[in-house]
Design a protein with these regions (language model features):
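A cytosolic small-molecule/anion-sensing beta-strand core signal
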Residues: 27, 55-56, 71-72, 90
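A short, N-terminal "cap"/entry segment at the start of jelly-roll beta-barrel domains
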Residues: 1-32, 111-120
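Short, charged/polar surface micro-motifs in flexible loops or helix N-caps
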Residues: 28-30, 37-39, 56-60, 67, ...
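Short acidic-glycine-tyrosine-enriched beta hairpin
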Residues: 64-80
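Conserved short histidine dyad/triad with adjacent acidic residue
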Residues: 16, 30-46
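Short, conserved beta-strand element in jelly-roll/cupin
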Residues: 35-36, 45-63, 97
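Ligand-binding loop in jelly-roll beta-barrel domains
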Residues: 80-109
Length: 120
């Protein structure tokens, strides 16, 4: 069934941080929605590129050779194999487009790893 998605309404349903939800599917990829605040772990993805789109807020992506600041309406693609660390001083709403096999923590498995993201 084809249906539209209201991004604002979907984000209102998310009440926690660093727990990506599936907002849609595109071929072999998920469109994930997540609220974040604070710092995440350094990690990389061995086999998948990862796209971060900032819907609300300001996101800092730390890289081993610097950092990139993303504001509302901006996105970045982190190529596979590149270590990165997302940081949000204030609450940030992100859309992520990534293959279904992508773990949110990449090559690291810990208490923040979401093995089976739920739909929203």
């Amino acid at each position: 069934m084809i249906s539209k998605v209201n991004i604002k309404d979907k984000f209102l349903q998310i009440n926690d941080y660093w727990n990506p939800r599936i907002g849609g599917e595109l071929n072999d990829s998920y469109i994930k929605m997540v609220k974040i605040r604070g710092g995440f772990i350094w990690h990389h993805h061995d086999h998948e590129d990862e796209m971060f789109f900032v819907w609300r807020g300001k996101l800092v992506i730390r890289l081993r050779n610097g950092e990139i600041v993303l504001n509302e309406g901006e996105f970045i693609v982190i190529p596979k194999g590149i270590e990165h660390q997302p940081i949000a001083e204030e609450e940030v709403h992100l859309l992520l487009i990534e293959p279904k096999t992508t773990l949110n923590t990449g090559n690291v498995v810990n208490e923040r790893t979401v093995l089976n993201p739920q739909g929203i």
